[in-house]
Amino acid sequence: QTDAGLWEFRNLSQHHCYTYLFHWAGSLAAEKIAKVLKDEKMGKLAQKLGKNAKNKIEQCYSASKKGYSQAIGTDRMDASCLQLINMNYLDNNSDRAKAHLKAMEKELKASNGLFYRYKHQDDFGEPETTFLICAFWYVEALACVGRLDEAIEYFDNIVGYSNHVGLLSEDVNEKDG
């Protein structure tokens, strides 16, 4: 079933990669619970859900971009797909994880080192601001694939956007901070 996705698009219902990532994560948790409860039926259902979720996630892979896209049937990149690395869907040592991260950087990384959620037009036009949660996901993904020095550098950059009491806003304009 299609949905509005993490970013709650008002006029765009798709099969979002992020949604299926959480189906996959939920299936892993359900498998663990089934083992503890010795519930074979639950275990089989969890495995079925996990297999279906993996299938849907893989349909989001864009061979041309060497990364996972926002949804099935589109090549649009979405920073929420950084979570494929952070949640260990992708093996962090794999070429695919590293290529996916590079694709994300190429498409969504701003000149100030922060990250856009996505770059395509939405209900309000083309995005003008980066989202700080995406920058934190980026830092985590860098650390996961072993790019620790860069992770520290970008984390320090993000902290620089806090106000006098250490609070961060949801978004930051790339041009004027």
What are these model-predicted stretches?
Residues 34, 41-44, 64, 68, ...:
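Secondary-structure transition/capping residues
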